[in-house]
Amino acid sequence: MLSVKQELLAALAGELETLSPGAGARAAFESPKVAAHGDFACTAAMQLAKPLKLNPRSLGEQLKAALEATPSFQRWVDAIEIAGPGFLNIRLKPAAKQQIIREVLEQAEKFGWLADRGAKMLVEFVSANPTGPLHVGHGRQAALGDAICNLYATQGWGVHREFYYNDAGVQIDTLTKSTQLRAKGFKPGDECWPIDPENPASKAFYNGSYIQDIADDFLACKTVKADDREFTANGDVEDYDNIRQFAVAYLRNEQDKDLQAFNLHFDEYYLESSLYTNGYVEDAVQRLIAGGHTYELDGALWLKSTDYGDDKDRVMRKQDGNYTYFVPDVAYHIQKFKRGYSKVVNIQGTDHHGTIARVRAGLQAADVGIPAGYPDYVLHTMVRVVRGGEEVKISKRAGSYVTLRDLIEWTSKDAVRFFLLSRKPDTEYTFDVDLAVAQNNDNPVYYVQYAHARICSVLAAWGGDAATLKDVDLSALEGPQAQALMLQLAKYPAMLTSAAEGNAPHDVTFYLRELASLYHSYYDAERILVDDEKVKLARLALISATRQVLHNGLAVLGVSAPQRM
């Protein structure tokens, strides 16, 4: 069943198509800048005036008359007013606004969802190297990735969550050597503990207490499980390969605990090493060579990435024979495409910005049918943590940064998710621990969850069957607070679509805060459980629909919707 807005948009599209073939596809409503001007605004007359060589206001009058003659506008629209150079301000009948309540209650968890489009996509996120605990930056990426997956699911996509990790790089060697020295009884600060000569303030080895934990368990010959595999240490401090495998498995297990605490589950963990063992890296390189997209210079192999928009050509294979880090990335994305993922989104830190052009250049040069601009990227900044008014920089667990687990333990999973999603990904963010645990209206997650719990309390006090509310008479919902609440509910589907298209889960947090604010205003203005049965049931239906949308929006963010607080 079409929603009221969809029905009106379809009517608008039909009239625009009559005026100018092809224009119907651009049918859209906007929210008026001033609420008193109406419920929807339409700028189509101004957009079409120039190509049709007509005066925009005259065209607006023509479009207004055509729309007023359509059955849909006659059914749902109270008035269409023309303003300025050709704006159409559309005012809905009360019944149109009330209809949104029935739509929410009938569709429940699926309100705002689009039909299955029969296409699958992949979102890669977190993808932390197995060299230490997940830090708060990984937490921001985890929250972003999971919410973006949920948003795309509402738009009919089959979504695959993937975690890619580097189990074959220099950092793994550093992890292994750090663990080996700890197992031999050495510690940071000892003469044999290396320091990076180019940056003395930065230790070349890992210094966190977790390295000692790995070494202790290695010496105790313990068994760890990660990625559905088990690995047992042999306790031999000279067995470098055994130490490496045990340390990687240990930290994968620890990272899994962090992800479980965050209620985050991946469909697949993809190992970088498999790209080499399966020959995918070499296949990609040979394809680029055979296509004439490389050249040799100074003993290195270069990709002609400037042919595809990069600012300079890039080294693929160094003089020592090792590939640079973007080469396996190219091979990995070729495999993503070959696995059937027509759309891919990568969530990464802003420090990866420089890799985008070279990876896309490699994919275009590979000539396997991958479209330009593949994959999409969402880049995020790091997170600053403040507690007690002071910045927190060090974690005993990690040795040099605040971990995701620290943040969850200090606050809650819900607070971490909501807070880390409350700003655009590329915006610097300060996480205020004290605010995240405050039980007041200044805490945004508390404010939204409290609105949900408050509604549940009213529904429980009523004690009736909420399923019957979708059939009640809603004509009593006429006050300004009720009207504002219904209009906000009606915006939810379009907000989901816009947030998904823009990879912008922060839009969901803004929407929920506004919906919660409107509910609290309505609750303060109108008593729900009144003696008049018709009024009471209508108000109960409105708050029940509000509860459902609060629940749905919080679910997109991966945040719980408590019934009591």
UniProtKB/Swiss-Prot annotation:
It is found in: Cytoplasm. Keywords: Aminoacyl-tRNA synthetase, ATP-binding, Cytoplasm, Ligase, Nucleotide-binding, Protein biosynthesis. It catalyses: tRNA(Arg) + L-arginine + ATP = L-arginyl-tRNA(Arg) + AMP + diphosphate. Monomer. CDD domains: Anticodon_Ia_Arg (cd07956), ArgRS_core (cd00671). This is Arginine--tRNA ligase. HAMAP family: Arg_tRNA_synth. InterPro entries: aa-tRNA-synth_I_CS, Arg-tRNA-ligase, Arg-tRNA-synth_N, Arg-tRNA-synth_N_sf, ArgRS_core, DALR_anticod-bd, Rossmann-like_a/b/a_fold, tRNAsynth_Ia_anticodon-bd. PROSITE patterns: AA_TRNA_LIGASE_I. One of its GO terms (biological process) is arginyl-tRNA aminoacylation. The lineage of its organism: Bacteria, Pseudomonadati, Pseudomonadota, Betaproteobacteria, Burkholderiales. Its main location: cytoplasm. It comes from Delftia acidovorans (strain DSM 14801 / SPH-1). It is an enzyme of class 6 (ligase). A motif ('HIGH' region) lies at residues 128-138. GO terms for molecular function: arginine-tRNA ligase activity; ATP binding. Its EC number is 6.1.1.19. GO terms for cellular component: cytoplasm. Belongs to the class-I aminoacyl-tRNA synthetase family.
